[in-house]
């Protein structure tokens, strides 16, 4: 019973992000439109019934409507992160990638560096493009001396894209294995993809 209670306590609370809130708002508007526009009761009821059966389609339409807004929001946060990195001239950036051992290597390195410096590792497994943007915007401040960026990839070119964003001066390559072989296509592609950090 103790383990069950502990597991329940460890469960994360549901977090509704700003993007989800915008999507819910657009979906609500789509469902309210018939109420505002259509005066015929029979036609209104018919449309509402049809829409209730086509919920997934309504969500897809809402997502399509929100696409321009989401692109602007994404561009805003990306530019904000890039400007912050450019403004921190003394910041040293270390990139870490590999098939296995990225997170543990990152955490060990952060513990060592934090003895003398103020090192910021990417939290948890935020090793994607959006994860790095989020880390820079939400966790980095003027007191950060070293940024340790964990970099994950599923296809060739992804590590190169991450390097263009944060521009690491140093790189650490951990073990390369067969993780994500189905998306990379071959062992050779995995090696090439991971070595993009060293080449950058």
Can you say where each PLM-predicted feature lies in the sequence?
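Phosphate-binding loop of NTP-binding sites
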Residues: 1-26, 30-200
